C-alpha cells in the first residue's frame, strides 16, 4: 500500500491510499462511510477477489489523515471526488471508463451526486446502504437542526450511532470503538444539506443510467432502506441490481457476512466492465421528454393548477411594483434585459413595498444560481484565455447568443486586446450592447445578428474563434436536432484546438412554477425541457468536443462546462 495527497478544487490537501497499482488494470475507488476513514477499507482492498484491480480510497474532509475540516456544503464532497478522478487520470493515466466506485452510507450519496451532476463516464457504481434519507428518531429533528444552524452556523451534532447497530461482528465493534481516528460528530449544516441532496437525487433518479448495484441492509437503524428502493425503481440503468442483505446492519462492509458482499460486488464489477459503451446519439432522455409534456399539457391535480393560476394572477396585479418583475412581464423572464437586471442584483421598486418584493424576487434560488453561473462562466473563460495566451495565440471569443453583452464587457476591461464577436438574435439587445461599446470606447468587439441555430450563418460571421460561448440558450430549446445544428456551425468555423464553453440546467426545484407563472420572451408560458448533464455532454461528444472541466453551484441547478474541439 502507498499513500499520498491530492489537491482538490479549493487547494485543500486530501489524503489517499493506493493498493496494488499496475498500469492497464481496471480501477476501483472505495469511499468510506461518514465518521470513518480509508484505513478501515484495508480488508476489502486486499481481499483476493480484488487482487486484479487498482484500489484507491481517500479520507473525506475532517476524517482520518485529511486535515482540511469538514465542509458544511455537501457539494464540496462531490467536487473532491471529481478532482480525485482527474488526479488519477493525470498521475496514474487512469481513464474514467476504467473506474468503478464502491461507496457506503453518506459516500453513496456523494457518488450518486457525482454521477448525476457531473456525468462522468465511469463503468458503474455499488451503493452500500446509501444514506439518501437518514433516520432521525426525534420528531421534526431535521427542521430543528436547520433552524438552529441559522442561529449557530458552526453547529456540531454528536452521532447517536453506536458500533452495535453497525455490525454484528464483535471484533469489528471493538475495532470501531477503539479507533482514535473515528469521528463521532457531524456538522449540522452538512447534515441538512445532505438530506436535501438525497431528496433531490431520489426524485431525479431517472437521470442516471450507468450500471448500479444497491446493497440494502435489512436491519438498518441509520438510514431508510425504503427510500433506496424508490431510487432503484426510478433508475434508467439497463444494468441494475438491488439486493437486501438479510439481517445486516448499516455497516455493510464490516458485517459478519461481508465476504458475501465482496462476491456480489466482484460479480457486478466484472459485468459492468464487460459492457460495451453506449453509442453516441442525439436522442433526448425520455424521462425529461415526459416531464416536459406533463408541463406543456398541464397534467396535474386541479388544486395545483389553481395554486399556480393564483400566483400568475398575483404577479400580474402586484408584480409591476417590483422593477425586476416588471421587466420580466414586459420583455420575458428569460430575456437578456431581465437577466442583466438579475446579474446587477440591486433591488428596486415602487412605494417601498416594491423594493421589498424585488429583493425577495432577486433572492429566489434560481436567480441566485444564475449569478453563480455567471461567476463560473467567467472563471472558466479566463482559464481558457490564459491557455490560449500561453500558446502564443491571439484570443478570439465568439458568443453565439450573447444578449446585451454583459459579462463580455467585463472580459474586455480585463483583457483589452482580445477580439470579441457577440451574436444576438434580438435587435433591442444589440442596440443596448452597442450603446455600451460606444460609451466605453471599446475596440475589436462587435455584434452580429444571425440565427445561431442555422449552421450556414456561421460562415457569414467572418470570424475564426478559439473560444466559443454557449450560455443560457440551449436551456430554452429542448430539440436536440436544433441544438446540434448550432454546435455543428461552431465547429465548422473554430480554430484547431479551440475551447467551447457551454451551460446546462440538469435540475431545477422551481420548474413547475416557472412554467405556469412566468412568461418567456415569446409571450408564452416559460416551459423548459431540462437536459441531464450526460445528455448535454453527449451532444458535444457527438460533435467531437471532449469535456475537460465543469463547475456547478451548491444547489445542483446550473453547470458550466469547458470542452475542447478534437482535431
Show where each model-derived region lies.
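Short beta-strand/loop motif that positions the catalytic acidic residue
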Residues: 208, 214-216
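Conserved alpha/beta-hydrolase
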Residues: 45-68
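Catalytic active-site module of serine/aspartate enzymes centered on a nucleophile-bearing elbow/loop
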Residues: 246-292
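Class I SAM-dependent methyltransferase Rossmann-like catalytic core
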Residues: 322-389
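Catalytic nucleophile-loop/oxyanion-hole region of alpha/beta-hydrolase
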Residues: 35-37, 64-95
Amino acid at each position: 500500500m502507498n499513500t499520498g495527497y491530492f489537491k482538490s478544487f479549493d487547494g485543500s490537501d486530501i489524503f489517499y491510499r493506493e493498493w496494488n497499482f499496475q498500469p492497464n488494470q481496471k480501477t476501483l475507488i472505495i469511499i468510506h462511510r461518514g465518521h470513518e476513514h480509508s484505513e478501515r477499507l484495508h480488508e476489502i482492498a486486499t481481499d483476493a477477489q480484488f487482487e486484479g484491480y487498482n484500489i484507491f480510497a481517500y479520507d473525506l474532509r475532517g476524517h482520518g489523515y485529511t486535515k482540511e475540516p469538514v465542509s458544511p456544503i455537501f457539494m464540496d464532497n462531490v467536487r473532491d471526488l471529481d478532482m480525485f478522478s482527474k488526479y488519477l487520470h493525470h498521475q496514474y493515466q487512469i481513464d474514467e471508463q476504467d473506474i468503478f466506485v464502491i461507496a457506503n452510507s453518506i459516500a453513496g450519496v456523494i457518488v450518486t451526486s457525482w454521477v448525476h451532476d457531473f456525468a462522468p463516464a465511469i463503468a458503474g457504481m455499488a451503493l452500500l446502504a446509501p444514506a439518501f434519507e437518514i433516520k432521525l428518531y426525534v420528531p421534526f429533528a431535521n427542521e430543528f437542526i436547520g433552524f438552529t444552524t441559522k442561529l449557530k452556523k458552526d453547529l456540531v451534532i454528536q452521532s447517536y450511532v453506536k458500533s452495535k447497530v453497525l455490525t454484528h461482528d464483535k471484533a469489528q465493534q471493538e475495532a470501531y470503538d477503539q479507533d482514535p481516528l473515528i469521528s463521532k460528530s457531524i456538522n449540522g449544516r452538512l447534515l441538512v444539506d445532505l438530506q436535501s441532496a438525497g431528496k433531490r437525487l431520489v426524485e431525479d433518479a431517472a437521470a442516471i443510467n450507468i450500471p448500479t448495484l444497491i446493497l440494502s441492509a435489512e436491519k438498518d437503524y441509520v438510514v431508510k432502506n425504503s427510500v433506496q428502493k424508490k431510487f432503484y425503481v426510478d433508475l434508467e440503468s439497463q444494468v441494475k441490481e438491488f439486493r437486501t442483505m438479510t439481517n445486516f446492519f448499516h455497516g455493510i462492509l464490516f458485517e459478519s457476512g461481508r465476504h458475501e458482499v465482496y462476491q456480489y460486488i466482484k460479480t457486478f464489477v466484472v459485468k459492468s466492465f464487460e459492457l460495451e459503451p453506449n453509442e453516441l446519439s442525439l436522442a433526448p432522455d425520455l424521462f425529461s421528454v415526459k416531464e416536459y409534456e406533463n408541463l406543456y399539457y398541464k397534467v396535474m391535480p386541479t388544486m395545483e393548477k389553481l395554486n399556480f393560476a393564483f400566483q400568475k394572477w398575483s404577479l400580474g396585479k402586484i408584480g409591476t411594483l417590483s422593477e425586476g418583475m416588471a421587466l420580466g412581464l414586459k420583455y420575458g423572464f428569460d430575456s437578456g434585459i431581465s437577466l442583466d437586471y438579475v446579474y446587477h442584483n440591486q433591488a428596486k421598486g415602487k412605494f417601498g413595498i416594491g423594493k421589498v418584493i424585488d429583493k425577495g424576487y432577486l433572492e429566489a434560488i434560481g436567480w441566485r444560481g444564475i449569478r453563480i453561473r455567471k461567476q463560473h462562466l467567467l472563471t472558466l473563460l479566463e482559464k481558457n484565455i490564459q491557455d490560449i495566451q500561453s500558446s502564443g495565440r491571439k484570443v478570439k471569443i465568439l458568443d453565439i447568443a450573447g444578449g446585451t453583452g454583459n459579462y463580455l464587457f467585463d472580459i474586455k476591461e480585463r483583457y483589452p486586446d482580445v477580439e470579441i464577436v457577440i451574436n444576438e438574435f434580438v435587435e433591442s439587445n444589440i442596440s443596448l450592447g452597442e450603446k455600451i461599446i460606444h460609451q466605453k470606447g471599446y475596440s475589436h468587439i462587435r455584434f452580429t445578428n444571425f440565427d445561431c441555430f442555422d449552421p450556414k450563418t456561421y460562415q457569414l460571421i467572418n470570424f475564426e474563434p478559439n473560444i466559443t460561448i454557449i450560455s443560457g440558450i440551449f436551456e430554452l430549446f429542448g430539440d436536440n436536432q436544433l441544438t446540434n445544428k448550432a454546435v455543428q456551425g461552431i465547429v465548422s468555423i473554430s480554430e484547431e484546438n479551440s475551447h467551447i464553453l457551454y451551460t446546462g440546467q440538469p435540475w431545477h426545484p422551481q420548474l413547475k412554477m416557472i412554467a405556469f407563472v412566468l412568461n418567456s420572451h415569446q409571450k408564452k408560458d416559460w416551459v423548459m425541457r431540462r437536459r441531464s448533464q450526460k445528455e448535454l455532454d453527449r451532444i458535444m461528444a457527438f460533435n467531437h468536443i471532449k469535456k475537460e472541466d465543469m463547475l456547478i453551484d451548491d444547489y445542483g441547478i446550473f453547470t458550466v462546462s469547458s470542452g475542447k474541439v478534437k482535431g
